[in-house]
């Protein structure tokens, strides 16, 4: 892969300008979009929480929580603005899942890791500040068995990275079209006008550090992480615009070789909201099962 094509792939990790026209739908839950102050990041971090139908009706009930991570170029409102909210309400209305919270934090271009230069410690923020904050602020159930993580594209990379690095914290992980590419592409620019493209990879160093990339890569982590008890689901389109199906196959092969149970699917489709919308329900049903929830009768 030449440098310009490599750059284009990662510039395009913004991938999806998610546009999905909302439709009339009787509300079955509630959305809160707020912010919290992070000492680690030295800034406010926005997040959106999707609260299940009975959240406001039963003030004593506690719920599992799914942390759902957005892709590059998106933000905490990904599920709210994309039509994902309608899909989630459909699942509740059709009684295909139990009730749990879904929380999406804004992650900018962090890839959900601590940056190479140490200035953007998003992983530390997420584990040390964000999880405790959400679980203090909302009526979540306590413990690993009631906490899942999932994501799309860059968010799929982040979900796998965080779950494989901290398997003691999560009972389940899902990733749709995760940004898995193996070895870091050779991306070098001498023209400062191209620095914006390189900036998309700045979290991995400037220039990007291949060794640092590999240390954080879910494909690397999957080879040795202690994944006992972690339920794993991932999928990708067979015509993924960025070739991420190859990385998904590689992850599948690694888990098979280690005899680690997981659910893996290659479906027809590319890297766009049409693909994600078609398969997001399966991921949410997977997490519902992992939480041990039965759909409401």
What are these regions (language model features)?
Residues 2, 20-22:
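Intrinsically disordered, low-complexity regions enriched in serine, threonine, proline
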Residues 25-297:
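Non-catalytic cap/lid and distal C-terminal segments of serine-dependent acyl enzymes
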């Amino acid at each position: 892969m030449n440098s310009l094509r490599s750059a284009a792939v990662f510039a395009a990790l913004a991938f999806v300008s998610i546009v999905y026209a909302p439709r009339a739908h009787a509300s079955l839950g509630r959305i809160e979009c707020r912010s919290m102050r992070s000492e680690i990041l030295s800034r406010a971090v926005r997040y959106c929480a999707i609260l299940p139908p009975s959240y406001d009706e039963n003030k004593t009930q506690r719920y599992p929580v799914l942390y759902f991570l957005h892709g590059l170029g998106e933000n905490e409102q990904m599920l709210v603005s994309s039509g994902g909210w309608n899909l989630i309400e459909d699942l509740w209305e059709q009684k295909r899942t139990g009730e749990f919270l879904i929380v999406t934090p804004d992650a900018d271009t962090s890839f959900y890791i601590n940056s190479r230069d140490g200035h953007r410690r998003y992983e530390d923020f997420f584990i040390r500040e964000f999880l405790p904050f959400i679980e203090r602020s909302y009526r979540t159930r306590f413990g690993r068995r009631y906490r899942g993580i999932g994501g799309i594209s860059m968010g799929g990379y982040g979900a796998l990275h965080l779950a494989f690095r901290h398997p003691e914290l999560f009972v389940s992980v899902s990733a749709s079209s995760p940004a898995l590419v193996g070895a870091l592409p050779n991306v070098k620019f001498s023209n400062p006008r191209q620095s914006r493209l390189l900036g998309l990879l700045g979290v991995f160093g400037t220039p990007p550090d291949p060794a640092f990339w590999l240390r954080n890569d879910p494909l690397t982590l999957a080879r040795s992480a202690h994944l006992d008890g972690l339920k794993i689901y991932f999928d990708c389109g067979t015509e993924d615009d960025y070739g991420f199906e190859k990385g998904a196959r590689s992850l599948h092969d690694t888990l098979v070789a280690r005899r680690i149970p997981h659910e893996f699917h290659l479906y027809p489709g590319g890297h766009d909201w049409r693909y994600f919308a078609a398969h997001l329900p399966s991921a949410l049903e997977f997490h519902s099962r992992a939480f041990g929830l039965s759909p409401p009768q």
